[in-house]
Every structure is written in C-alpha cells, then in structure tokens.
From Swiss-Prot:
Coiled coil: none annotated. GO terms for molecular function: neuropeptide hormone activity; neuropeptide Y receptor binding. PROSITE patterns: PANCREATIC_HORMONE_1 (PS00265), PANCREATIC_HORMONE_2 (PS50276). This is Pancreatic polypeptide. Pfam families: Hormone_3. GO terms for cellular component: extracellular space. The gene is PPY. It comes from the Eukaryota. It is found in: Secreted. The modification Tyrosine amide is found at residue 36. GO terms for biological process: feeding behavior; neuropeptide signaling pathway. Hormone secreted by pancreatic cells that acts as a regulator of pancreatic and gastrointestinal functions probably by signaling through the G protein-coupled receptor NPY4R2. CDD domains: PAH (cd00126). Keywords: Amidation, Hormone, Secreted.
Length: 36
C-alpha cells in the first residue's frame, strides 16, 4: 500500500504545505483507483 504523506505541521512553509497537498492527492488517487 502507498505510504500516507506526513503532515508537515501548522508552522510549515507554503512550499512544504504545497508538497504535502500534492503528495496527499497522489496518495488518495492511488487508494481510490479501481483494481483491474
């Protein structure tokens, strides 16, 4: 199973938050992709 990205924290930089958001979207896409 894909690793869940780690939340960088409330004091994270905008760059860290953007990276986390992108990784989280990829993670969710992997989880919800149908298994054919």
């Amino acid at each position: 199973a894909p690793q869940e990205p780690v939340y960088p924290g409330d004091d994270a930089t905008p760059e860290q938050m953007a990276k986390y958001a992108a990784e989280l979207r990829r993670y969710i896409n992997r989880l919800t992709r149908p298994r054919y």
